[in-house]
Curated annotation (Swiss-Prot):
The active site is at D84 (nucleophile). One of its GO terms (cellular component) is cytosol. HAMAP family: TruD. InterPro entries: PsdUridine_synth_cat_dom_sf, PsdUridine_synth_TruD, PsdUridine_synth_TruD_insert, TruD_catalytic, TruD_insert_sf, TruD_pseudoU_synthase. GO terms for biological process: tRNA pseudouridine synthesis. This is tRNA pseudouridine synthase D. It holds the Pfam family TruD. The gene is truD. The keyword Isomerase applies. Its EC number is 5.4.99.27. It comes from Thermus thermophilus (strain ATCC BAA-163 / DSM 7039 / HB27). Residues 159-302 form the TRUD domain. Responsible for synthesis of pseudouridine from uracil-13 in transfer RNAs.
Amino acid sequence: MDLVFRPERYPFLTQDLPGVGGEIRVEPEDFQVEEVPAYLPKGEGEHLYFLLEKEGRTTREVLEFLRDEVGVPEKEIGVAGLKDKRAKTRQWFSIPRKYEDALCLLENLQGVRLLAADLHTNKLRTGHLKGNRFHILIRRPKGGVAEAEAVLKRLAEKGVPNYYGPQRFGLGGLNPVRGYKLVKEGKGRGSPWLKRFLIGSLQSLLFNDWVALRMALGLYDRVVLGDWAKKHATGGEFLVEDPGEAERALRLEISATGPLFGKKYPEAQGEARAIEDEVLARYGLKREEFRARRGARRPIRVPLAEWKVEEAPEGLWLSFFLPKGSYATSLLREVMKVEALDHLEAEPAPEDAEGL
C-alpha cells in the first residue's frame, strides 16, 4: 500500500446503505458552517472578541488583513479554528483591546461582515470551541430524504468515522509522501511550519489506516484491553483494563483512540498496540522515528448530534453538529457514497495541532 491519500481506500461504515449521490459546494452558500464556541466573551477584559461572517475568504486571509491593515501583530490575533474558503462561515476572532477603534477597517475586506463584538479576559486560542454546526446543500441528488436519514440514523447510533478529510493531505494527496521522507531522512527544505504540516499529513494517513483496520477487524465500536479510550461526555482518556468497558463502547459512551505518533502521547498496550504496530509495519516505520514530534490520541469516531434532512427545490439540506477536530466530509461521504468532494481547502486542522 502506498502513502498517497485516496479516499476510496477507506471503507464506509454504512456500506450496506445506498448513498444519495449529488454534488456539494456548487455555490459558497451551499456549505454553511457556524463555529460553536467553548465560551462567550464576559463583557470585560483586555481582549476584543468579534464574530465574523465570511464568504469566499479563508481564515488565513482574515488574519493577514488584521495584521497588515489593522496593524495587529500576528501572534496577538486569536482564532479557535480554520474555516474553508468556498463556504459561508461564522467564526470568532480576538485581538488586543487597544486595536478596537481600528476594527471598522474590516468594512474594507470584501466578503466579510461583522456580526458581534465584546470584551473578554483572555486571548482566543486554538481549540477553544465545542465544535461546528453545518448546514449543507446536496444538489442534484439521486436519492431522497429516506436514504439520507437511514445513513444518518446509523451514524447517530454508531458514531461518525473520524477519518481525516482530504484537506489534510494536499493537492493529489501527496503530502504524506513528503512527510515520510522527512521522517526517514530527518531533514529537508522548507520552513518549520511546513515540515510540521507535512509530517502531520503522514500522521493523519496512518491514523486513517488504523481506523480502517479496526473496522476490518470488527473493532470499530469496541474497545479491547490495552486500548486508550475517550469518554465522549467529558473528553477524558483512560487505559482499558476491564473487559466490562466493552458495553460502554457499544453505547457510544466511550471510544477507542488511535495514535498520532510522537513522543508525548499515551501508548497502547497488548492487542491494541499490536494493531497500531501493524499499520506502521506496512510502511517500514517505527514509533521512535516520530520522537522529534509531539504526539496525541484521536478517537476512532465522534458522536453525531442535531441532525436533520430537508428536501428543497434545489436539493437536500443536511444540518448537523460535529465536535471540534472532526470533518464534515467524513459524514458527507457516508451519505453521498461519492468521493469527489471538490473545492476543499488544503489547510491543517488546528484543533489537532498538538499532535503534529
